A protein has these predicted regions:
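A cytosolic small-molecule/anion-sensing beta-strand core signal
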Residues: 21, 70, 146-147
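Short hydrophobic alpha-helix segments
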Residues: 29-31, 85, 154
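ATP-binding/phosphotransfer module of carbohydrate and carboxylate kinases, centering on a glycine-rich
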Residues: 1-65, 75-78, 96, 100-106, ...
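A charged helix-plus-loop insertion that forms the helical arch/lid used to bind
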Residues: 79-90
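Generic structural signal for well-ordered beta-strand positions
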Residues: 26, 82, 151-152
Length: 314
């Protein structure tokens, strides 16, 4: 069985795995993504350390390629991550130093684009030719397969759906520097700031829970706290606007939600989002990933396997 190493570089965690050509994860390792240092070289070094650990395992002897999925934007020509709002350094060099270190082909793909490949290979979208994958994590990202082909765009950044404009009322600023983007409202990083802006605008004076984290806000909604439920109505509208734009753009038969917010609170997200989409558009099937956060890893592996075999990576 052909084996590759897959890496998932996120804003919070750095994961790596040995993955077989049958989508089996043979070994897995994870560390926090480095945020301190003089340059992105500290992240490159952390990836190299994870790869070295996996290659030292008995299963690592047959590795033929390395696939890296990362939060974007990406510069695929140089093999860099560049100016990502969710990574601490403006440039992280990936393919050059890692390829030089191990003498293996290294491919780089956006983590959400990898996610849709992972879902289509081994998850909820297996066998589907028109799929959108949406990750609700530190940021919001997406990937789309249309008529069986992965959409990458000119620079591999097609599907940066977190930057869909969804609001002009609160005018919250996104990590990219512009205002009104979906990610500025509904990502795990930014939900607390949206709650604070909504609370002020709605003149909500008493809150019986700590609104400083999405976990606390969604947890209060699960216990039917009236303030949290009122906020879910507003958040559901924002999510519906983002997903409606995705449906119109890609015409998917299935949308797979992933990321911590979807995995832990997907029932709440869908409950407050779906009715607001259904007013305007036919609903595709919307479901939560069953791959326990490993869709980008599996997608990075699928991409690396195809590239190593001479394919386009899809």
């Amino acid at each position: 069985m052909t084996t590759v190493i897959a890496v998932d570089l996120g804003g919070t965690n750095l994961r790596a795995a040995l993955v077989g050509s049958d989508a089996t994860i043979l070994a897995h390792t994870a560390v926090p993504t480095p945020t301190a240092g003089l340059s992105g070289a500290v992240i490159t070094a952390a990836i190299i350390a994870r790869v070295e650990a996996l290659l030292a395992l008995p299963e690592g002897r047959e590795v033929t390629a390395i696939g890296v999925a990362s939060a974007g934007p990406l510069d695929p020509g140089r093999g860099w991550v560049t100016n990502s709002p969710n990574i601490a350094f403006p440039v992280v060099e990936i393919t050059g130093p890692i390829g030089d270190r191990f003498g293996l082909p290294v491919s780089l793909i956006n983590d959400a684009r990898a996610g849709v490949l992972g879902e289509r290979w081994a998850g909820a979208a297996r066998g589907s030719d028109n799929v959108v994958y949406i990750t609700l994590s530190t940021g919001i990202g997406g990937g789309a397969v249309v008529n069986g082909r992965l959409l990458l765009g000119m620079d591999g950044n097609a599907g940066d759906i977190g930057h869909i404009p969804v609001d002009t009322h609160y005018n919250l600023v996104c990590g990219c520097g512009f205002a009104g983007h979906w990610e500025a409202y509904a990502s795990a990083k930014n939900i607390p700031q949206f709650f604070a802006a909504w609370r002020k605008a709605a003149d909500v004076r008493r809150v019986a829970f700590d609104a400083g984290s999405p976990r606390a806000i969604f947890g209060a909604a699960r216990t039917e706290d009236p303030v949290a439920l009122a906020f879910m109505e507003v958040l559901g509208e924002v999510n519906a606007r983002g997903v409606s734009a995705v449906i119109v753009a890609y015409d998917p038969e299935i949308i797979v939600l992933d990321g911590p917010l979807a995995r832990y609170y997907g029932d709440i997200v869908i409950r407050y989002m779906e009715p607001r989409i259904d007013r305007y558009l036919p609903l595709p099937r919307i479901t939560v990933s069953s791959l326990a956060g490993r869709s980008p890893l599996l997608g990075a592996a699928a991409y690396a396997l195809d590239r190593a075999a001479g394919g386009p990576g899809i």
